[in-house]
Amino acid sequence: MIRLLPWLNVVTLGGRSIIDQGLGAVGPVVGELREALAEHRMLILTGPGIRARHILGVGLDLGLPTGVLAGLTSVEAEQNGHLIAALLAAEGVSYLPHTAVGHQLAVHLAASRAVVSHGYPPYGLYEFPPEVGKIPPHRTDTGAFLLADAYGAARTIYVKDVDGVFTSDPVAADGSRAELIPRVGATELLAMNLDTLPVDALLLALMSRAKHVTEIQIVNGRTPGNITKALQGEHVGTIIHVD
């Protein structure tokens, strides 16, 4: 199998965990990405955040099907993508729709060190129906992974507001008992059946079928330097690997 863009770094910014937190979270993250442009070429992807939950709530009340819900929530992720691209515009970074990311990413990255898009997969109306209910099963985390694997990216990094995967919820009442899991296999992690995960469980299931990406990294974007370290290949946060 040929890696189309073996130098590519896919960096996914959590919608709720980073972008929804406002300037205090977004500003330092964007600043760190800006500094990294000199050494790394990146595809920066965004999630929809809390607004997606509002849309899903209204859409479910209206009886909308899964495919329509997927399209509506992806619009919110796109809005966040435009925001991040605007903050990096001075460096020549722009927002690309999925059609351009799918067919013209290489030429855009030849002109600029990074581009921004949203992480929702382009299934839209053709989204797979879930086993239960109507909520789209493929969301930002899985969409970003599918893009990274399709291009054979060097690194796939998820920027959240937690230090990685914990044995229990670190912000719960008994969060002091939570222990960070520095490295774990995807299948092993699924088998743990943890109450909370910083990424979609479906992403872990997809990893076993990946062609190129054999591990992903979850880092805390609220800690200065974590994104830079991950881009440089250092072990920060949690690394989930194919097992």
Task: Indicate where each model-derived feature is located.
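C-terminal catalytic "cap/lid" subdomain
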Residues: 1-243
